[in-house]
A protein has these predicted regions:
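Conserved AMP-binding/adenylation subdomain of ANL enzymes
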Residues: 207-224, 234-274, 288
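Conserved ATP/PPi-binding loop(s) of AMP-dependent carboxylate-activating enzymes
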Residues: 357-361, 373-404, 440-442
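Conserved pre-ATP/AMP-binding loop-to-beta segment of ANL
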Residues: 17-18, 32-33, 151, 155, ...
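Gly/Ser/Thr-rich phosphate-binding loop
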Residues: 249, 264, 269-277, 286-350, ...
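AMP-binding/adenylate-forming catalytic core of the ANL superfamily
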Residues: 104-114, 121-123, 275, 387, ...
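Conserved AMP-binding/adenylate-forming core of the ANL superfamily
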Residues: 16, 36-88, 105-110, 158-162, ...
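Conserved AMP-binding A3 loop
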Residues: 45-49, 184-208
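Structural core segment of the AMP-binding/adenylate-forming
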Residues: 64-65, 93-162
Length: 543
């Protein structure tokens, strides 16, 4: 009989028992003149000493503004050097950073600010077609705890980053008071109840996860990492930024949002040795019409995560992009995020058919979804993980925390997986109905809850259907209320118009079908599997 599907990650290298600020100071002392941040779209270049000086000034400015440890500060911006500056300045003084997705609309922004109790918000003035200044103003009366908003590059921002010499001693005093187990970050992950949940992460959680993601890539102070993935997500701020600062490597920001050409240009111009992305990003880069004009020979490693990588794509990444040591990671926000990772020397098969083995200091197991018993290797069950990386809980939501983390400390991911005899893990599906669109995790129930606010919708069900570009797209089945005199919701365009400005663009259903009934089980439950099968056939999609 096969052994049980449970593995313990390596323990030979100790966990970092530091705060993020302590770790940054250590790196600055070691490599003060190394490039810390190169932001090409801002024409900006900071050494580690430059960066640290700015972090200290902003930290003192935040204290002068009245913030104190454990206060929450929201950050709403695409990828700028200033995002990283705020990330480390808040960590320096124990202020909890609340990441806000740049794609959020007013409905989601107000919820995140209120649920986390943000006193302070720092934001870009705008992004793409979103006027953040106007959007913040529109929710001001809905966010009573929000005392102040400062926009990048405004006079208020310039005053904030200039710092306050009177508070510099307070910054230094706080160093001895902060604990690695203090909460330092809240990241929102949508819940099946329709309400986002704030995964609360500590210094220990995210510093160590970033450090070990870097260790498994063999990062050193000579590496230069191109980070086109968003900072608001763990992929950018933990696996990217914290992996770099804990190793003295350089963070290269190609653009404020993903752009294949700018990413390739950044790698070529800055001689990057590492590149991050979800598979769709690598596919877009490989397909770029002028791909061959960029010299990518400096590349060695990186991380691909967020969705399975097709074998053909992995081969091209290795052969055409020189990413011979690229690694695959699996994780979730609630686990800081990485639980498993492949190694640079792993075979092509391991890097396309599995998500690697247990991360250092992380335990993993495959459990029966109903009984919770550990299954034998080779059997499909729920992927569970335990260790330093598991969040302290969902912010002010003990019920949901208890549902996710059992009494033995195991985080139940909701993902279906199989563990091989060698300890590698294959993710084979999801227990929940989560849809993954271009690396973004979307929970249909959240979209359904919002669509129910339309006055003409009686019932709505949202599913994921296959898509060649994004992996999956959202589809809404809608039953309208009967006997409407002059219905306004009659087309897909009508639905898109209703969603515009209220929910993130990637949450707006790509397909809509108006129905009179839904497929049901004999006990009255919606059969989403049948809905998906019917939709695929009706739309002529390839599975």
């Amino acid at each position: 009989m096969p052994s049980l599907a449970i593995e313990m990650g390596a323990r030979d290298q100790p966990l970092l028992a530091q705060t993020i600020g302590d770790n940054l100071r250590q790196t600055v002392a070691r490599v003060p003149n190394n490039d810390a941040i190169v932001s090409l779209h801002q024409d900006l270049r900071w050494t580690y000493q430059d960066f640290y000086t700015r972090v200290q000034r902003l930290a003192s400015g935040l204290l002068a503004a009245g913030l104190k440890p454990l206060d929450r500060l929201g950050l709403w911006s695409p990828n700028y050097a200033e995002w990283i500056l705020v990330q480390y300045a808040t960590a320096e003084i124990g202020v909890v950073l609340v990441n806000i997705n740049p794609a959020y609309r007013t409905h989601e922004l107000a919820y995140a600010l209120n649920q986390s109790g943000c006193r302070f918000l720092i934001a870009a003035p705008s992004y793409l077609t979103s006027n953040y200044q106007a959007m913040v103003a529109s929710v001001q009366d809905q966010t009573p705890e929000l005392e102040r908003t400062v926009f990048f590059w405004s006079p208020e921002w310039e005053a904030l980053i200039a710092g306050d010499a009177q508070y510099q001693a307070s910054v230094e005093d706080l160093r001895g008071q902060l604990n690695p187990d203090d909460p330092i970050n809240i990241q929102y992950t949508s819940g099946t109840t329709g309400f986002p949940k704030g995964a609360t992460l500590t210094h220990r959680n995210i510093l160590n996860n970033g450090y070990f993601v870097g260790e498994l890539q063999r990062l050193t102070e000579q590496d230069r990492m191109c980070i086109p993935v968003p900072f608001y997500h763990c992929f950018g701020m933990v696996m990217g930024n914290l992996a770099c600062t804990s190793h003295g490597a350089t963070m290269v920001i190609p653009s404020d949002g993903f752009d294949a050409a700018r990413t390739l240009e950044a790698v070529s111009q800055e001689r990057c040795t590492a590149l991050y992305g979800v598979p769709t990003m690598f596919i877009a880069e490989l397909a770029f019409e002028d791909f061959t004009k960029f010299d990518l020979s400096s590349l060695r490693t990186g991380v691909m995560a967020g969705a399975p990588c097709p074998v053909a794509v992995m081969k091209q990444c290795i052969e055409r992009m020189h990413l011979r040591e690229v690694t695959i990671c699996y994780g979730m926000t609630e686990t800081s995020p990485v639980s498993t990772q492949t190694l640079p020397e792993d075979s092509l098969v391991h890097r396309t058919e599995t998500v690697g083995r247990a991360h250092p200091h992380v335990d993993i197991r495959i459990a029966h979804p109903e009984t919770g018993e550990t299954l034998p290797r080779g059997e499909t069950g729920e992927f569970c993980t335990r260790g330093y990386s598991v969040m302290s809980g969902y912010w002010e939501d003990p019920v949901k925390t208890t549902e996710a983390i059992d009494e033995a400390g195991w985080m139940h991911t909701g993902d279906l997986a199989v563990m091989g005899l060698d300890g590698t893990v294959q993710i084979v599906g999801r227990i929940k109905d989560m849809v993954i669109r271009g690396g973004e995790n979307i929970y249909p129930r959240e979209i359904e809850e919002f669509l129910y606010t339309h006055p003409e919708i009686e019932e709505v069900q949202v599913i994921g259907v296959p898509d060649k570009v994004y992996g999956e797209q959202l589809m809404a089945w809608i039953k309208r209320k009967p006997d409407l005199a002059s219905p306004q919701l009659v087309s897909h365009d009508d639905l898109k118009a209703f969603c515009a400005g209220k929910i993130a663009h990637y949450k707006v259903p790509h397909y809509v079908q108006f129905v009179e009934t839904f497929p049901m089980t004999v006990t009255g439950k919606i059969r989403k599997v049948e809905m998906r099968a019917r939709s695929i056939e009706a739309l002529g999609l390839e599975v």
